[in-house]
Amino acid sequence: MTIDCPYDEVIHQWSSINVLSNEFIGMHYKECNREELFKLYTENSEGLVIFTLGANQIMYGRKGEMPKFFTPYHVDVVSTLGAGDTFKAGCVYALLKGMSDLETIQFASALAGVAISRFPLPLNPPSLEEVQALIKNS
């Protein structure tokens, strides 16, 4: 898995998942249309491509597919510190557990959702039960 990696890099081409943050896209591809950029990413990898946009819809998919969208879970936000890293950690966990693309997005989104509902995150990390409850109850 990799994060914020250009579409023409070897690491992207061989990654199982590439998570691209809104910040990275805005800095490196500010002139590009998101749908066209997404197509460049998916055409250059067999892996799952994920564009995150904070609280806005997540765009994800694979080569040869139309992009799919997922709206992150609504939670009471206490601090967004660590949200992106937590989402990415959720993708690693999902990859290791063999989750489907949708399950990966759901799990990573729920993990980040639980994480931003508390502060400080390092002293109170999300539990698997909390993540599963957010998915189930949303």
Model features per residue range: what roles?
Residues 1-39, 48, 57:
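Conserved beta-alpha-beta core of the PfkB/ribokinase-like small-molecule kinase fold
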Residues 34-138:
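Conserved phosphate-binding/catalytic region of the ribokinase-like
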